[in-house]
Amino acid sequence: MSTVRKITLKSSDGENFEIDEAVALESQTIKHMIEDDCTDNGIPLPNVTSKILSKVIEYCKRHVEAAEKSETTADAAAATTTTTVASGSSDEDLKTWDSEFIKVDQGTLFDLILAANYLNIKGLLDLTCQTVADMIKGKTPEEIRKTFNIKNDFTPEEEEEVRRENQWAFE
């Protein structure tokens, strides 16, 4: 029986999180720190608060568990003569879980994007950015400004010039 190596992550507000190495390896940034043997006193993450780090860890744990589950299912299917399509249902379960996970307030969503980018977690970055893209899709510039609380700093003349230059986007 092998022991699971633990990695300590330190949030910007001083909280420590001890997680399995497999979960930590979901982050390319942390993976490189582990490879460079920079984990002795924990890995400081100055750009990630404990609130956001706990959400990131939750996401990574779930995705590691899902990957392990689908590997086990694939191994079991390969061992039997009849193959089943059980991995399809776990993919659907994960998509459902992701869609529930990402139902957060705007501030948290943007902090998750920043953390996913900093930690280089492609799946989480894709999920969060797609969520923002879906929030924008089909909206006018005014609606987008209202959604994201963006102040319009264009003069009417500048706005008209942008509309002319990007006519294709307004059709």
UniProtKB/Swiss-Prot annotation:
Pathway, per record: Protein modification; protein ubiquitination
Cellular localization per UniProt: Nucleus
Key word Nucleus present: yes
InterPro entries assigned: SKP1, SKP1-like, SKP1-like_dim_sf, SKP1/BTB/POZ_sf, Skp1_comp_dimer, Skp1_comp_POZ
Xref: SUPFAM superfamilies: POZ domain, Skp1 dimerisation domain-like
Tissue-specific expression: Expressed in tips, cortical layer and epidermis of roots. Detected in whole seedling, vascular tissues, pith and vascular bundle of young stem, leaves, inflorescence meristem, young floral buds and organ primordia, flowers, developing seeds and through the valve of siliques. Expressed in male meiocytes, pollen, embryo and endosperm.
This protein's UniProt keywords: Auxin signaling pathway, Chromosome partition, Developmental protein, Ethylene signaling pathway, Host-virus interaction, Nucleus, Ubl conjugation pathway
Chain positions covered by the region annotation Interaction with the F-box domain of F-box proteins: 113-171
GO biological process entries: auxin-activated signaling pathway; chromosome segregation; embryo development ending in seed dormancy; ethylene-activated signaling pathway; jasmonic acid mediated signaling pathway; protein ubiquitination; response to auxin; response to jasmonic acid
GO CC terms, sorted: cytosol; nucleus; plastid; SCF ubiquitin ligase complex
Major localisation: nucleus
Signal peptide segment: none
Entry function: Involved in ubiquitination and subsequent proteasomal degradation of target proteins. Together with CUL1, RBX1 and a F-box protein, it forms a SCF E3 ubiquitin ligase complex. The functional specificity of this complex depends on the type of F-box protein. In the SCF complex, it serves as an adapter that links the F-box protein to CUL1. SCF(UFO) is required for vegetative and floral organ development as well as for male gametogenesis. SCF(TIR1) is involved in auxin signaling pathway. SCF(COI1) regulates responses to jasmonates.
Subunit structure: Part of a SCF E3 ubiquitin ligase complex composed of SKP1, CUL1, RBX1 (RBX1A or RBX1B) and F-box proteins. Interacts with SKIP1, SKIP2, SKIP3, SKIP4, SKIP6, FIB1/SKIP7, PP2A13/SKIP9, SKIP11, PP2B11/SKIP12, PP2A14/SKIP13, SKIP14, SKIP15/FBX3, SKIP16, SKIP17, FBW2/SKIP18, SKIP19/FBL20, SKIP20, PP2B1/SKIP21, SKIP22, SKIP24, SKIP27, SKIP31, SKIP32, SKIP34, ADO1/ZTL, ADO2/LKP2, ADO3/FKF1, AFR, COI1, EBF1, EBF2, EID1, ORE9, PP2A13, PP2B10, TIR1, UFO, SKP2A, CPR1/CPR30, NUP58, At1g55000, At1g67340, At1g78100, At3g04660, At3g61590, At4g38940 and At5g49610.
The family this protein is said to belong to: Belongs to the SKP1 family.
Protein name per Swiss-Prot or TrEMBL: SKP1-like protein 1B
Gene: SKP1B
